[in-house]
Amino acid sequence: IHLHWYEYPPMNPMMYPLLLIFMLFTGILCLAGNFVTIWVFMNTKSLRTPANLLVVNLAMSDFLMMFTMFPPMMVTCYYHTWTLGPTFCQVYAFLGNLCGCASIWTMVFITFDRYNVIVKGVAGEPLSTKKASLWILTIWVLSTTWCMAPFFGWNHYVPEGNLTGCGTDYLSEDILSRSYLYVYSTWVYFLPLAITIYCYVFIIKAVAAHEKGMRDQAKKMGIKSLRNEEAQKTSAECRLAKIAMTTVALWFIAWTPYLLINWVGMFARSYLSPVYTIWGYVFAKANAVYNPIVYAIS
């Protein structure tokens, strides 16, 4: 445990039952939602498409994250401290990082596939089962390789300040440890966010151009619209814009707190108390709950 955390008194005992209730609620919703997503997609023949393999992979990574992290969190919240030993602390942090990284990059590939279909259209190469499987394999191999690095001295997995979980060491002043967090932030936050925004900007532009083309064609044909009245009220352009805004907003809400905790820990640790460290994984784990809704349903 870093000496920084000894500067603070123990957390209010009421925080632990509140966190336990939140984790219980989140854990049940996440496991149930992602299990149903996996079961429906794997048992419905019409849904077993290459693109939906990515959705299933997202559900699996979110399910595994909560399945491996939910029970230890319940135990540590009950005892008000980490009681599972240093080895499991590292395993716990590794699994959390691995599943989180896999989820993030699966979302990126889902977005890229939508970009390929909508923006490039017939000019784009259609996603095959082989290609989707290769993407999924690449996601897990790279995520595993990246998250194994702290076991070999590039940063470390240590207890969080609230002592209910473990994660990367963002309080170390060692340049090697910090370099890992710089690359980590780029790999799992800035780059995926940039790709997501880029893809959705061009998706919205492409759909807007298509909508304009349909309106122009309707004028040439001397009719008000090629769509019926109900479809006009909720045009594809508006629906897609809402999905894009929701996706980017939820991404930002889910992962920004954890990023800020890491960077504040590196550069302004005096502002970082044990209570604040809770919010990072609270928002990140909530992401695993609404992913099935955002990606499977949309």
UniProtKB/Swiss-Prot annotation:
Glycans are attached at residue 162. The modification N6-(retinylidene)lysine is found at residue 285. Residues 41-52, 113-131, 202-242 are cytoplasmic. Contains one covalently linked retinal chromophore. This is Rhodopsin. It is found in: Cell projection, Rhabdomere membrane. It comes from Procambarus orcinus. The gene is RHO. The lineage of its organism: Eukaryota, Metazoa, Ecdysozoa, Arthropoda, Crustacea. Its main location: membrane.
